[in-house]
C-alpha cells in the first residue's frame, strides 16, 4: 500500500479535474487550496476535512486517536441528519496525554479503545483517525487496526489524514481514499439492479436529500449508496455494484468518482439539486446514464413526465413569493459548488445577484457562474468583513446569504441575513426546497423588525424645533 506521502503527491495530479489538467508540473505541485496557518488549523485542516467527509456514516464509531482538543474542535460542525442510527453523534477519542507520548503507550491505548467501543456499542465498523500528534510520534494505526479487526471480527478502518499534511479539501480526498482502500468492494450485494446509483459528495444537510430521494423512488431508481449523508457501512461496502453515479460536490470527492469509474466502470456526472432547472437536469442525466448502462428505455419518458408534474407544482407554489421578491438584491457569500447552484436557484425565484463569492470554487464552477451573470465583477474571491459591511450598509443588497461566521456583519449593518451553509436549519434541495428557500428569504426581508432597528433611538433624536427641555426634564 502506498505511503501517506505518496498518496498526497498523487492528489496533485487529478485527471478528472479540468483545472488540474491545465497546470504545468510546478504549479500543479502547489495544489489548489492554501494550507492552514500554524496555530489556526482548527476547522480547516486535513483531519477536519476527513472527519467531515466520513462522520455522516451513521452506524460507524468514529474514534479520534489524538489529544482531547482534536475531537472537541471537530464534533458536530456540520448539520447532517440521520434517519435511524445515532452512533455517529457520539464522540470517541483516545485522549492521548503527554504521559502516553513519553512512555509510548498511545498505540496500546488505541487498541484498548477499539475493544471497549466494540463491547459497549457493537458498531458496524470503527473508523480510526490519525491526527498531528499521533502521526508525528510515529503511531502505526494501520497495524493496530489490522490487529483489532482480526481480534474482534469487525472492520476497523484507518483514516490517515493528520492535520499538518494539508488543507480541509485534501482531507476530504484522503477520506475518499480510505473508503476505496478498506470499505468499497468488500461486500457483494445479492440484490444488485440495473437502476442502482451512487450519490457522491451529498451530506444530507438538514435532511436535504430526503426531499430528493422520493423523486428517485417514483422513477424506480434506487440509491445504492449516498456518500456520506445518512449512509450505512453496508451501503458503502456494496457501492461498487451501482450502475451510475452523481457527483454533488466535486471539490470533495472527485478522486472517489474517478477511481470508481476506473475500477468498476461506474460513469458519473456533476450536478446539483438546488433550483427547479438544475433538479430537472440532474434527474434527466441520471436517467440517461442508467439507460446507457442497461436500464429500461422507458425510464427516460417516465422521468420527463415526473419533471413536468413536479415543475408545474413548484412554479405554482412560487407564485405566492415571486411578486414579493422580484428585483430584490442578494449578496451571496458562500463558495464551492454553491457559488453557481444556489445562485441559479435564486435567479429562478426572481432575485438579482449583486455579488457572489467564488472561494473554494473550481474553474468549472466559475465558468458556470459566468454564464449566469452578465457582469464578471459580481464574482469575488475571499471578501473581507469590511467589504461585506460596506455592501450591506450602502444598501447595495437587500439580504445576505452566507454562513454563520459572517452573520454578525449583516446584523451590524441592520440588514436581513439567511444561513445557506452547513449550519442551516432548513432544507433547500429539490423542488420543495426551492419553495422553502423563497419562503425563508421572504420571511427575512419582510420581517418588521428591520424597519424598527433602522429607526434612530430616542436618545439620538434632537428635540423638535420650538420645544425646550426644562431643567427637571434634562436631569431625568
Curated annotation (Swiss-Prot):
Please name the pathway: Cofactor biosynthesis; Fe-Mo cofactor biosynthesis
* GO biological process terms on file: nitrogen fixation; protein-containing complex assembly
Q: Which UniProt keywords apply?
A: Nitrogen fixation, Plasmid
Task: Give one Pfam family.
Answer: Oxidored_nitro
List, alphabetically, the Gene3D superfamilies matched: Nitrogenase MoFe cofactor biosynthesis protein NifE, C-terminal, Nitrogenase molybdenum iron protein domain
The highest taxon in the source lineage is Bacteria
Q: Does the keyword Nucleotide-binding apply?
A: no
> Function of this protein?
This protein may play a role in the biosynthesis of the prosthetic group of nitrogenase (FeMo cofactor).
Q: Which PROSITE patterns match?
A: NITROGENASE_1_1 (PS00699), NITROGENASE_1_2 (PS00090)
Protein name in UniProt: Nitrogenase iron-molybdenum cofactor biosynthesis protein NifE
Instruction: Look up and give the organism this protein is from.
Output: Rhizobium meliloti (strain 1021)
Family according to the record: Belongs to the NifD/NifK/NifE/NifN family.
Q: Name one GO molecular function term.
A: nitrogenase activity
* Keyword Manganese in annotation: no
Per its UniProt record, what InterPro entries does this chain match?
Nase/OxRdtase_comp1, Nase_comp1_CS, NifE, NifE-like
Amino acid at each position: 500500500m502506498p505511503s501517506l506521502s505518496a498518496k498526497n503527491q498523487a492528489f496533485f495530479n487529478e485527471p478528472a479535474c479540468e483545472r488540474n489538467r491545465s497546470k504545468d508540473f510546478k504549479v500543479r505541485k502547489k495544489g489548489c487550496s492554501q494550507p492552514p496557518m500554524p496555530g489556526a488549523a482548527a476547522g480547516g485542516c486535513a483531519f477536519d476535512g476527513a472527519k467531515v467527509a466520513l462522520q455522516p456514516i451513521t452506524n460507524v464509531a468514529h474514534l479520534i486517536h489524538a489529544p482531547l482538543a482534536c475531537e472537541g474542535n471537530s464534533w458536530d460542525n456540520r448539520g447532517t441528519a440521520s434517519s435511524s442510527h445515532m452512533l455517529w453523534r457520539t464522540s470517541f477519542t483516545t485522549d492521548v496525554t503527554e504521559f502516553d507520548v513519553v512512555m509510548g503507550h498511545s498505540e496500546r491505548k488505541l487498541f484498548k479503545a477499539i475493544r471497549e467501543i466494540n463491547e459497549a456499542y457493537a458498531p458496524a465498523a470503527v473508523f480510526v483517525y490519525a491526527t498531528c500528534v499521533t502521526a508525528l510520534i510515529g503511531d502505526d494505526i494501520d497495524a493496530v487496526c489490522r490487529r483489532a479487526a482480526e481480534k474482534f471480527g469487525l472492520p476497523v478502518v484507518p483514516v490517515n489524514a493528520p492535520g499538518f499534511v494539508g488543507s480541509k479539501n485534501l482531507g476530504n480526498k484522503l477520506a475518499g481514499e480510505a473508503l476505496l482502500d478498506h470499505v468499497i468492494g468488500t461486500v457483494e450485494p445479492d440484490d444488485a439492479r440495473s437502476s442502482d446509483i451512487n450519490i457522491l459528495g451529498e451530506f444530507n444537510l438538514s435532511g436535504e436529500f430526503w426531499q430528493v430521494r422520493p423523486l428517485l423512488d417514483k422513477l424506480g431508481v434506487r440509491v445504492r449508496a449516498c456518500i456520506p449523508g445518512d449512509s450505512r457501512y453496508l451501503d458503502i461496502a456494496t457501492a461498487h455494484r451501482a450502475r451510475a453515479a452523481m457527483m454533488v460536490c466535486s471539490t470533495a470527492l472527485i478522486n472517489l468518482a474517478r477511481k470508481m469509474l476506473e475500477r468498476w466502470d461506474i460513469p458519473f456526472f456533476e450536478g446539483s439539486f438546488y433550483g427547479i432547472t438544475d433538479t430537472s437536469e440532474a434527474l434527466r442525466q441520471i436517467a440517461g446514464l442508467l439507460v446507457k448502462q442497461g436500464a429500461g428505455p422507458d425510464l427516460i419518458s417516465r422521468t420527463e413526465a415526473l419533471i413536468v408534474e413536479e415543475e408545474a407544482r413548484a412554479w405554482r407554489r412560487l407564485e405566492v413569493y415571486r411578486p414579493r421578491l422580484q428585483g430584490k438584491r442578494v449578496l451571496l457569500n458562500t463558495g464551492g459548488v454553491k457559488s453557481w447552484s444556489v445562485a441559479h436557484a435564486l435567479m429562478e425565484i426572481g432575485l438579482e445577484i449583486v455579488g457572489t463569492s467564488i472561494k473554494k470554487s473550481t474553474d468549472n464552477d466559475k465558468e458556470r457562474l459566468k454564464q449566469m451573470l452578465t457582469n464578471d465583477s459580481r464574482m469575488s474571491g475571499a471578501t473581507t468583513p469590511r467589504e461585506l459591511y460596506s455592501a450591506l450598509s450602502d444598501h447595495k443588497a437587500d439580504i445576505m446569504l452566507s454562513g454563520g461566521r459572517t452573520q454578525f456583519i449583516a446584523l451590524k449593518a441592520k440588514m436581513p441575513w439567511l444561513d445557506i451553509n452547513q449550519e442551516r436549519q432548513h432544507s433547500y434541495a429539490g423542488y420543495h426546497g426551492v419553495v422553502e428557500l423563497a419562503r425563508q428569504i421572504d420571511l427575512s426581508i419582510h420581517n418588521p423588525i428591520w424597519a424598527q432597528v433602522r429607526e434612530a433611538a430616542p436618545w439620538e433624536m434632537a428635540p423638535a424645533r420650538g420645544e425646550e427641555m426644562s431643567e427637571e426634564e434634562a436631569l431625568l
